[in-house]
């Protein structure tokens, strides 16, 4: 099993030194991710592509899914490599492979060639295409918009028949740009803005300001972990949780109602700047879009930025909400975001749309900044990979089992894509599929006389959700221990 990985076009047009550096980083990223799932995977860098090989055909679907989510990959080809002796031999090998596929269909042949040969790429296309047309009675050549395009790459004495072409997410490899700190709330905007910086080549760390208690923090951890695991698992990142309840309380007590929204955002960027400075991070990322809510006017955004000691990046600044939600669906964070309450907007009933600097500074003069300092000093710093370990400690009261009892039902909380790809086999026991992001709204509608055993592939989400359900009064939950690490 072999894949030919093609780099993002913007990488290919850079200087040779930069292109080599980017390709080297991408090769390392691919290796870091794929070898976690298949230790025998080989990743080799060439001048204009990266070669991925694996002997384990059973891992094909998983390797394809992983490659499709690695930043820096424009597309990749699934190929079958064979040695050849001459052009007629290439035709014979191609005929044996595609004859069945071309029955009753129109086709064309496209050849890319490297090395010295007695034929050109066009001559190869004509010879192979003509031969296929003669030997397969029910097929017909069509050069424009054919049913099937037979793609062949020829390099020296080997031919690669392209079995499939898979799109990547493009962008730059993680690590080619500097680190950023994303202010993640669990909503649509912050998840998408985090993804956009990952796709642009930055390692994204996460800073969460907790305004809503343990359940809110669990939900945000789920989103951060989901984004990291799907798109940036090649790198270690930090998850920082700052308890902002005291800061919000001080604002509610000391700040004029209309100025609360801007003041709260200024406190957040102050705190985030301190965290960024601690880890030598140059920029913080927010999900704000111009005019989307009252605090997101140019005047207010400028005043918010004045409180920051780090560069503030807003990748969604010109995006419509509809576009943002569509992107959230693409990256798989939309359902998590739907379950997240928006806390920032509820503390001010009549927010100002054009804050005045002097008035903001006067209101902040009433604020006790020791509360902000204390919140930052008491922040919790976590390697995002340790979310599973931390959750295991928190869910000590949730029983983990590997053998199912009579009254127990497996609750498969993986995404629909994962369950379709790899269904859970339970034997005689019932299996209910309910993605983790729907548990908060749908678990209560299940038959509560049953005991539900939560299952996910890695064991992380099942433990997070078990904690959430326990905190909400459901005692009939357990965790399936098969994949707990």
UniProtKB/Swiss-Prot annotation:
One of its GO terms (biological process) is thiamine diphosphate biosynthetic process. ATP binds at residues 183-184, 265, 287, 296. Residues 61-165 form the THUMP domain. It comes from the Bacteria. Its EC number is 2.8.1.4. InterPro entries: Rhodanese-like_dom (IPR001763), Rhodanese-like_dom_sf (IPR036873), Rossmann-like_a/b/a_fold (IPR014729), ThiI_AANH (IPR020536), ThiI_fer (IPR054173), ThiI_N (IPR049961), THII_Thiazole_biosynth_dom (IPR026340), THUMP_dom (IPR004114). CDD domains: PPase_ThiI, RHOD, THUMP_ThiI. The active site is at 456 (cysteine persulfide intermediate). Its main location: cytoplasm. The keyword Ribosomal protein does not apply. One of its GO terms (molecular function) is CCA tRNA nucleotidyltransferase activity. Keywords: ATP-binding, Cytoplasm, Disulfide bond, Nucleotide-binding, Redox-active center, RNA-binding, Thiamine biosynthesis, Transferase, tRNA-binding. Residues 404-483 form the Rhodanese domain. It catalyses: [ThiI sulfur-carrier protein]-S-sulfanyl-L-cysteine + a uridine in tRNA + 2 reduced [2Fe-2S]-[ferredoxin] + ATP + H(+) = [ThiI sulfur-carrier protein]-L-cysteine + a 4-thiouridine in tRNA + 2 oxidized [2Fe-2S]-[ferredoxin] + AMP + diphosphate; [ThiS sulfur-carrier protein]-C-terminal Gly-Gly-AMP + S-sulfanyl-L-cysteinyl-[cysteine desulfurase] + AH2 = [ThiS sulfur-carrier protein]-C-terminal-Gly-aminoethanethioate + L-cysteinyl-[cysteine desulfurase] + A + AMP + 2 H(+). Pathway: Cofactor biosynthesis; thiamine diphosphate biosynthesis. The keyword Cell membrane does not apply. It is found in: Cytoplasm. Disulfide bonds join 344-456. GO terms for cellular component: cytosol. Catalyzes the ATP-dependent transfer of a sulfur to tRNA to produce 4-thiouridine in position 8 of tRNAs, which functions as a near-UV photosensor. Also catalyzes the transfer of sulfur to the sulfur carrier protein ThiS, forming ThiS-thiocarboxylate. This is a step in the synthesis of thiazole, in the thiamine biosynthesis pathway. The sulfur is donated as persulfide by IscS. Belongs to the ThiI family. HAMAP family: ThiI (MF_00021). This is tRNA sulfurtransferase. It comes from Haemophilus influenzae (strain PittGG). The lineage of its organism: Bacteria, Pseudomonadati, Pseudomonadota, Gammaproteobacteria, Pasteurellales.
């Amino acid at each position: 099993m072999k894949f030919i990985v093609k780099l993002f076009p913007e990488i290919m047009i850079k200087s040779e030194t930069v292109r080599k550096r980017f390709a080297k980083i991408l090769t390392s990223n691919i290796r870091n991710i794929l070898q976690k799932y298949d230790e025998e995977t080989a990743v080799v860098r060439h001048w204009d592509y990266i070669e991925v090989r694996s002997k384990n055909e059973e891992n094909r679907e998983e390797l394809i899914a992983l490659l499709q989510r690695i930043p820096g990959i424009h597309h990749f080809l699934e190929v079958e490599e064979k040695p050849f002796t001459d052009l007629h031999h290439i035709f014979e090998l191609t005929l044996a492979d595609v004859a069945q596929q071309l029955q009753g269909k129109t086709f064309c042949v496209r050849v890319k060639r490297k090395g010295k040969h007695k034929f050109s790429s066009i001559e190869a296309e004509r010879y192979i295409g003509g031969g296929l047309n003669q030997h397969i009675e029910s097929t017909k050549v069509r050069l424009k918009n054919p049913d099937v395009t037979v793609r062949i790459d020829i390099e020296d004495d080997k031919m690669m028949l392209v079995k499939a072409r898979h799109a990547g997410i493009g962008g730059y490899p993680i690590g080619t740009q500097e680190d950023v700190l994303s202010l993640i709330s669990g909503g649509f905007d912050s998840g998408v803005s985090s993804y956009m910086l990952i796709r642009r080549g930055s390692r994204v760390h996460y800073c969460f300001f907790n305004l809503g208690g343990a359940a809110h923090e669990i939900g945000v951890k789920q989103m951060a972990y989901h984004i990291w695991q799907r798109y940036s698992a090649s790198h270690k990142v930090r998850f920082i949780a700052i308890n902002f309840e005291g800061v919000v309380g001080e604002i509610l007590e000391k700040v004029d109602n209309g100025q609360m929204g801007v003041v709260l955002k200024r406190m957040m960027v102050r705190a985030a700047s301190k965290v960024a400075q601690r880890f030598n991070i140059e920029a913080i990322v927010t999900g704000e879009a111009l005019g989307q809510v009252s605090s997101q006017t140019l005047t207010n955004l400028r005043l918010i930025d004045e409180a920051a000691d780090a560069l503030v990046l807003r990748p969604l600044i010109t995006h419509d909400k509809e576009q943002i939600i569509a992107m959230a669906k693409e990256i798989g964070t939309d359902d998590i975001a739907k379950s997240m309450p928006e806390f920032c907007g509820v503390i001010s009933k009549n927010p100002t749309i054009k804050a005045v600097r002097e008035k903001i500074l006067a209101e902040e003069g009433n604020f006790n900044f020791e509360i902000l300092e204390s919140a930052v000093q008491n922040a919790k710093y976590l390697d995002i990979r340790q979310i599973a370990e931390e959750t295991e400690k928190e869910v000590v009261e949730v029983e983990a089992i590997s053998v199912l009892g009579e009254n127990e039902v497996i609750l498969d909380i993986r995404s629909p894509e994962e369950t379709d790809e790899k269904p859970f086999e339970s034997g005689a026991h019932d299996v209910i599929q309910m993605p983790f992001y729907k548990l908060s709204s749908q678990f209560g509608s299940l038959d509560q006389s049953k005991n539900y055993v939560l299952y996910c592939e890695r064991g992380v989400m099942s433990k997070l959700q078990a904690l959430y359900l326990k905190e909400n009064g459901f005692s009939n939950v357990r965790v399936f221990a098969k994949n707990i690490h």
